[in-house]
Regions:
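Conserved hydrophobic/aromatic pocket- or pore-lining residues that grip, position, or stack substrates
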Residues: 35, 57, 79, 85, ...
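Acyltransferase
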Residues: 28-33, 62-65, 282-306, 343-364
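Structural helix-boundary/capping segments
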Residues: 41, 119, 170-270, 275, ...
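Short, well-ordered beta-strand elements within core beta-sheets of diverse protein domains
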Residues: 16-23, 102-105, 222-229, 334-335, ...
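N-terminal, positively charged, Ser/Thr/Ala/Gly-biased leader segments
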Residues: 25, 29-33, 40-102
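Short glycine/serine-rich loop/turn segments
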Residues: 77-224, 272-274, 371-393
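Short helix-loop capping/hinge segments that flank enzyme active sites or metal/cofactor-binding pockets
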Residues: 5, 77-97, 263-272, 301-303, ...
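An N-terminal boundary/leader segment
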Residues: 1-59, 297-299, 457
C-alpha cells in the first residue's frame, strides 16, 4: 500500500479516492494526513473549517486501514476525508449554529447522517462555518468569526453552508454535508464554483440537525444535502445519506427513479432567466443563455415560457411568510408569529403549487434558473437584510428579493442541483440551478454531471 498520497489525488473525486483506498493504491491515513495538511496550509485566511477534529480523524483513518488489511473493503466513501456543517451534531464536538449562547453545547451522539457517513467509511476532519441560526448568505458569527470566498477574500462564500463551500473550492476536501432552506446549499455552491444538491423534501433524515435547546423536530421546508467539488459525488453521497430513519425505516425502503433521460439528447428543458419578484444581472442571464445553446447543440429541447408554470410571485410571497415563521422559531431574541389559520392557508397554497409543478414536469424534464441574481457579493457587517442592497447591472436591488430564486424549489419540496457554468467579468463563479420533479433527484444530478463534462471538454 502506498502511504504517501499521490498529488493527483489532491483534486480527485470522492469516488476516485474511495476506489484508491479500496484497491490499496493509497492508505486512508495518507489521504487523511494530506487533507489535514491542506487545511493547515490554506485555511488561515479563509476560516472555513472552524471546528477541527484531526486526532479522531487520524484514529478513524488508522481503523479504516486496519479493516482493509483484514479484507473488509466495504463502504462507498471508504477512507474519504470530508467535513460537515457546524450545525450537525457530532459527538464530542460543539454545535452552536453560530450563536454565542450555545457555545458550550456539546452533543453526546452523532446526527443520523453523520453516522451514515462514518458507516460508509468517511473520515470526518471537522465542521465548517455558518451564520447565526443558519440565517444569512454569509458565514460569519460571534463564535467562529468570518469565512471569506477563496476566489476573492473581500466577498462572501455564501451561507449558510458557506464554510463547506469555501473548503471545497479551496481544495481542502472533496465532500461536505450541508443543509438548505433558503438556498443554503445552492447559493454557496454558486458563489464558490462547486456543486451542491438540495434534495427532495424529507428524502434525507434530519435527526441530529436541530437548534440546541429544541426537541429536535424536523424543520418544515429544510433539507439536508451533499456538496462536492465533482458532480458525480453528489449522487455517491445521496446513495449513502438518503432513506428513512427511525420508525419509518420499519416499513419503508427508498427506490429513487433513474434519470429521466440518460443523455442530454432529447432532454426537455424550461429555461427561466426572469422572475416577477427578483432580478438577475446580465452576466448571470448570459451564462444561462450560453448554457442553453450548448444543450441545444447536444440535442436538448429548450423552451423559455410555459402556460403550465405556477404563479411565481404568489409562490414567493407564501414561501417568504412560511420561511420567516420557521426560521425565527427557537432563535434568541424573538420570533415572527402567525395564526394557525394563516399557517394552514400556507399549507393549502403549497399543496396547490405542488400539483402545478407536477403538471409542468409532465411536459418538461428539468427547469433551469439562476441560483442567485449575481455572483458573490462583497462582505457586509450590516445584520438587517432590509438595510442591505445588491448592485445588479449597476442598479440597487433589494437583498431579500433573491430568496425568490431558491424559493421556487424549496416551497414545493423539489430537488435542485447547483452547478458551476461560467465566470463573471470579475472572475467569480456563476452557477445554474437545475430543478426537477419531486423525487427525481437523480435527474438533476445527472444533468449537472453532463454539464460538468461539457465544460471540461
Amino acid at each position: 500500500m502506498t502511504h504517501a498520497a499521490p498529488s493527483d489525488l489532491d483534486s480527485a473525486s470522492a469516488g476516485d479516492l474511495a476506489e484508491a483506498v479500496r484497491t490499496r493504491r493509497v492508505s486512508a491515513v495518507a489521504l487523511c494526513d494530506a487533507a489535514i495538511a491542506r487545511i493547515e496550509r490554506l485555511d488561515e485566511p479563509i476560516n472555513a473549517v472552524v471546528v477541527r477534529d484531526f486526532d479522531r480523524a487520524r484514529e478513524q483513518a488508522r481503523a479504516c486501514d486496519a479493516r482493509i488489511a483484514e479484507g473488509d473493503t466495504a463502504g462507498a466513501l471508504l477512507g474519504v476525508p470530508m467535513t460537515v456543517k457546524e450545525s450537525y451534531n457530532v459527538a464530542g464536538l460543539p454545535t452552536t449554529w453560530g450563536i454565542a449562547a450555545f457555545r458550550d453545547f456539546v452533543p453526546t451522539e452523532d446526527a443520523v447522517l453523520v453516522r451514515r457517513l462514518k458507516a460508509a467509511g468517511a473520515i470526518l476532519l471537522g465542521k465548517t462555518n455558518v451564520p447565526p441560526s443558519l440565517g444569512d448568505w454569509q458565514s460569519a458569527n460571534p463564535v467562529h468569526g468570518v469565512t471569506v470566498n477563496p476566489h476573492d477574500p473581500t466577498r462572501t462564500p455564501g451561507g449558510s453552508s458557506g464554510g463547506g463551500a469555501a473548503a471545497l473550492a479551496a481544495g481542502m476536501v472533496p465532500l461536505e454535508l450541508g443543509s438548505d432552506i433558503g438556498g443554503s446549499i445552492r447559493v454557496p455552491a454558486h458563489f464558490c464554483g462547486v456543486f451542491g444538491h438540495k434534495p427532495s423534501f424529507d428524502l434525507l433524515p434530519s435527526r441530529g440537525h436541530a437548534p440546541p435547546g429544541t426537541d429536535g423536530a424536523g424543520i418544515d421546508l429544510a433539507v439536508c444535502g451533499p456538496m462536492a467539488r465533482r458532480a458525480g459525488d453528489l449522487d455517491l453521497a445521496l446513495g449513502v445519506l438518503a432513506g428513512p430513519d427511525g420508525d419509518e425505516a420499519n416499513g419503508y425502503r427508498l427506490d429513487l427513479p433513474a434519470p429521466r433521460v440518460p443523455t442530454i439528447d432529447g432532454l426537455r428543458v424550461l429555461l427561466l432567466d426572469t422572475h416577477p419578484s427578483a432580478r438577475a444581472d446580465a452576466p448571470t442571464r448570459e451564462a444561462l443563455h450560453l448554457l442553453a445553446g450548448d444543450l441545444v447543440r447536444e440535442g436538448a429541447r429548450i423552451e423559455r415560457s410555459s402556460a403550465l408554470l405556477t404563479e411565481l410571485a404568489g409562490v414567493h410571497r407564501a414561501y417568504v411568510q412560511m420561511l420567516m415563521t420557521i426560521t425565527t422559531y427557537g432563535a434568541p431574541g424573538g420570533r415572527e408569529v402567525i395564526s394557525a389559520h394563516d399557517w394552514f392557508n400556507l399549507v393549502q397554497r403549497r399543496a396547490k403549487v405542488r400539483r402545478e409543478w407536477r403538471a409542468l414536469f409532465a411536459a418538461f424534464d428539468v427547469v433551469l434558473a439562476p441560483v442567485f441574481g449575481t455572483a458573490a457579493f462583497p462582505l457586509t457587517d450590516e445584520p438587517v437584510w432590509s438595510k442591505r442592497s445588491l448592485l445588479l447591472d449597476g442598479e440597487p436591488s433589494a437583498f431579500g428579493d433573491q430568496l425568490a430564486w431558491s424559493g421556487m424549489a424549496t416551497f414545493a419540496g423539489l430537488p435542485a442541483t447547483a452547478a458551476p457554468i461560467a465566470k463573471s467579468p470579475e472572475g467569480l463563479p456563476i452557477g445554474v440551478q437545475i430543478i426537477g420533479a419531486f423525487l427525481h433527484d437523480r435527474t438533476t444530478i445527472a444533468l449537472a454531471r453532463q454539464i460538468e463534462a461539457l465544460r471540461a471538454g
